[in-house]
């Protein structure tokens, strides 16, 4: 998945933080557009950047299960599929066009 703008990157990173950690992008170094641009140029995906933020700030990952919210295993980082789901929730389908994992999932 190739991000072209810091706006796209920050939208996805913010959604991952909100959905999986009940946290906000504001107050983290990922809120800085220069940091977002550096991630884009280095090929770092939002889920990878959010994993680093979660480790740095000691954020517990949350999961939604049958009985509501619960803590996820601390050694279970976000993966690409979590990012694909975030893009779908945000309606950023243009980012998903060339992602083999999404194309396979969408055609199933």
Residue ranges and their predicted role:
Residues 1-108:
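C-terminal alpha-helical interaction appendages
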């Amino acid at each position: 998945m190739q991000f072209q703008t810091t706006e796209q990157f920050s939208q996805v990173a913010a959604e991952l933080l909100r959905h999986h950690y009940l946290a906000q992008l504001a107050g983290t170094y990922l809120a800085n557009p220069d940091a977002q641009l550096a991630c884009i140029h280095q090929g770092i995906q939002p889920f990878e950047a959010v994993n680093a933020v979660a480790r740095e700030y000691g954020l517990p990952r949350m999961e939604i299960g049958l009985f509501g919210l619960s803590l996820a295993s601390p050694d279970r980082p976000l993966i690409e599929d979590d990012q694909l789901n975030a893009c779908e929730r945000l309606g950023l389908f243009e980012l998903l066009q060339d992602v083999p994992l999404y194309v396979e999932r969408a055609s199933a």
